């Protein structure tokens, strides 16, 4: 299946099975926001749980925080966001739609292998294909404004955070002192951020409200490059360990002239989404932010955010290595990479097309489905009791509707690793049939061994 059709198919699957809904759909929806349904929120939470386990609880040198969405306005002035967090905006004189000029230029270069000789004049309108007819680029702020207090005036002006990082930086000293940490160490945060994107789109890839998984790792100057490479390698391996095919991932080195104002070096981990205009899309950036953040916040707040190294009797401002990942983008990637179509036998002796999400078991929204072979009262008590017992450990679905093959298909397409069938023999032999998602192999397991059988195969879930 072509990759673009996988995007369309996955989007339809998400809407049909309750992973993702258009925000405010009864009012026409919006391209810039999506709601996560029952299965979507489980997948999202499982991704966050694996990130937190990898980045925080499995390491002795990283701790977590949960910082406010609305910070003092001066934080964003000092960090440079108010001044430089802008994008070049152009308007098509054909359709009067607005686009980021840098995105148009990048897409042209990726398609043709070279930048446009005449700049924007060589770029056709993305919607109509007409020869380019563009306004001059204008600076467009990516910050979303809000007002606190009874009057919408300058005094009450605040910003919704465009990144979680600044909340970490302003708490650097608090965390270092209360947690008795010292560089090299990291502070992690998962939370909502907001950016006034000019052209949100590509499903949940680019939205104005999104969730980030960020960690700021504070190191001694001079050790930053080694730690930067460590986190590039570690983060790339995290995606592979969770089942992403290595050939669908790549590292993209930001050219020096395109680095953010705080960055010494930035490397993106990208996935082959195969969007209409570009093959690769950024999953996360790993940036060497130097000492920029702690230095400017020391100057802006008057608070000393340096570190005194007692071993060397030196005082220095830590450099920061930042792996920053987008949760929605990660979820979209896991769904696309796991989507698979094959054939499964049906009750008539033939085969049917089977859709299966081959998600890593740690990510699967539902871990086990309990399926009584019949709705008859003789099976119901045992099946319901079994489902209740398994729910103490995992997210369990209980489905009694339709033929057993159809119920298997329903679980396959949401990625459920194991289906447990309670049949009439179960009443006699106290055993159930356990079916594995990917191989469709079935084994008979005694009821008193079922919990241990599943636990061995759901480690880390």
UniProtKB/Swiss-Prot annotation:
Pfam families attached to this UniProt entry: HGTP_anticodon (PF03129), tRNA-synt_2b (PF00587)
Enzyme Commission number, as recorded: 6.1.1.14
GO molecular function (one): glycine-tRNA ligase activity
Gene3D superfamilies per UniProt: Anticodon-binding domain, Bira Bifunctional Protein, Domain 2
Domain of life: Bacteria
GO biological process: glycyl-tRNA aminoacylation
Keyword annotations of the record: Aminoacyl-tRNA synthetase, ATP-binding, Cytoplasm, Ligase, Nucleotide-binding, Protein biosynthesis
Annotated residues for binding of ATP: 195-197, 205-210, 282-283, 326-329
Binding site for substrate: 100, 163, 210-214, 322-326
Top EC class for this record: ligase
Main location as per UniProt: cytoplasm
Compartments, as annotated in UniProt: Cytoplasm
Family annotation (InterPro entries): aa-tRNA-synt_IIb, aa-tRNA-synth_II, aa-tRNA-synth_II/BPL/LPL, Anticodon-bd, Anticodon-bd_dom_sf, Gly-tRNA_synthase/POLG2, Gly_tRNA_ligase_bac, GlyRS-like_core
Keyword Cytoplasm: yes
Catalytic activity: tRNA(Gly) + glycine + ATP = glycyl-tRNA(Gly) + AMP + diphosphate
Cellular component per GO, a single term: cytoplasm
Entry's family note: Belongs to the class-II aminoacyl-tRNA synthetase family.
Subunit structure: Homodimer.
Function: Catalyzes the attachment of glycine to tRNA(Gly).
Name of this chain's protein: Glycine--tRNA ligase
Gene behind this protein: glyQS
